[in-house]
Amino acid sequence: MKSIVESINEAKNFFFALVVKSSDDKVKIFSVKTNYNGVEDFASDIAANDDDADTIESWFKAGVQYSRYDGFNDKFKKFLESVKVTKDNFYTIMPIQNMKTRPNAVYNFN
């Protein structure tokens, strides 16, 4: 099975919602942006159990950005570790092609 980071890095030039289940059984959603160099930026936990288009847009407005030229992938891996993303609690990556519309598909990598 490909790692979550590898799966995200293969999806070029997309916004994603990364959905995980926390240890207290709550769903947490993280926003991720990729480009042709792989993962570019991501946001901390901002919303849960809500796929409303306005909420999706707010994730990116509140997102914490990191430079891909300054060890970003290491930072992203540490981020995934810090929220304890594993194959057991990783739900889906939802591509968001248009910030004004809902995700048009859901990809499962586990």
Question: What does each model-identified segment do?
Answer:
Residues I4-E6, E10, E81:
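Proteolytic processing junctions in secreted/extracellular precursors
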Residues K12-F30, D52-T55:
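Short aromatic-glycine-(Arg/Gly/Cys) micro-motifs in beta-strand/loop hairpins
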Residues V20-K21, K33-N35, T86, M94-I96:
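A structural detector for beta-sheet-dominated domains
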Residues K26-A48, Q65-S67:
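A short, exposed loop/beta-hairpin motif centered on an aromatic-Gly-Thr core
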Residues N49-N110:
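Short, mixed-charge low-complexity intrinsically disordered segments
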